[in-house]
Design a protein with these regions (language model features):
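Residue-level preference for hydrophobic side chains embedded in well-ordered alpha helices
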Residues: 18, 22, 26, 30, ...
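Hydrophobic positions on the alpha-helical face of helix-turn-helix-like DNA-binding modules
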Residues: 48, 72, 128-129, 141-142, ...
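Arg/Lys-rich amphipathic alpha helix in sigma70-family domain 2
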Residues: 58-60, 71-91, 107
Length: 172
C-alpha cells in the first residue's frame, strides 16, 4: 500500500498495514535510543506510534515510506532525549559514572559502549550515523536531514573518526 493516503475512510487500515511492514525498523530505532532497556523501548515505541499517527496525513510521498518513518521516529526520540536530559534519572547518573570508570577488560559488550558513545554525539550527527549503521543510503539520509549527499558523506566520515577516537579512549 502506497502513501499518501487520501481516502480518510481507509486511514486506520493503511496505518496499521504500514506499522506491520515497518515494526522491526521502529523497534530497532527505539532500541538504539533506549540503549536496549526493554521497558524504555516499549515506552519509546508507543511515543513513535503516536507521532507516526499524528503526522500520517502529512506524508507526501517525496521519499520512501521507510525513510519517512525513520525521520519521524528519530525526531521523536530526539525530542524524548531532550525532555529526559532536563531531569536525569538515578540510572543515567550511575551509568555515566560506570562508563567513565570502566577499563577495557571491564567492557563485556562493545556494541553497548558504541551505543552509549553514539548517544553522546550531537543530535543530528547521532541520527546520521544511526541511519548509516541501519543501512540507509547517503541519498536516503540526505532526504531525512535536508542535507546534500556530499554533506552526509562528510559527516559520516567525521563521525566515524570521532567514534573511533572515543572508543579507543574508553578502551584504554
Amino acid at each position: 500500500m502506497l502513501f499518501p493516503i487520501r481516502d480518510k475512510s481507509n486511514k486506520e487500515q493503511a496505518f496499521n498495514a504500514m506499522l506491520l511492514r515497518n515494526k522491526a525498523l521502529i523497534w530497532h530505532i527505539c532500541s538504539d535510543y533506549s540503549l536496549g532497556k526493554a521497558w524504555k523501548v516499549e515506552d519509546c515505541m508507543q511515543e513513535v506510534i503516536v507521532s507516526l499517527w499524528r503526522y500520517f496525513d502529512t506524508f507526501e510521498g517525496r521519499s520512501s515510506e521507510r525513510t519517512w518513518i525513520y525521520r519521524v521516529a528519530t525526531n521523536t526520540m530526539l525530542m524524548l532525549r531532550r525532555k529526559d536530559s532536563r531531569y536525569p534519572t538515578t540510572e543515567q547518573i550511575e551509568a555515566h559514572g560506570e562508563l567513565n570508570n570502566m577499563s577495557g577488560e571491564a567492557i563485556d559488550d562493545n556494541c553497548q559502549l558504541l551505543r552509549q558513545l553514539i548517544s553522546g554525539l550531537p543530535e543530528e550527527n547521532g541520527m546520521i550515523i544511526r541511519a548509516h549503521l541501519d543501512g540507509f543510503s547517503y541519498k536516503e539520509i540526505a532526504e531525512m536531514t535536508d542535507l546534500t549527499e556530499g554533506a552526509v558523506a562528510m559527516r559520516i566520515a567525521r563521525t566515524k573518526q570521532q567514534l573511533k577516537e572515543l572508543f579507543e579512549k574508553e578502551m584504554q
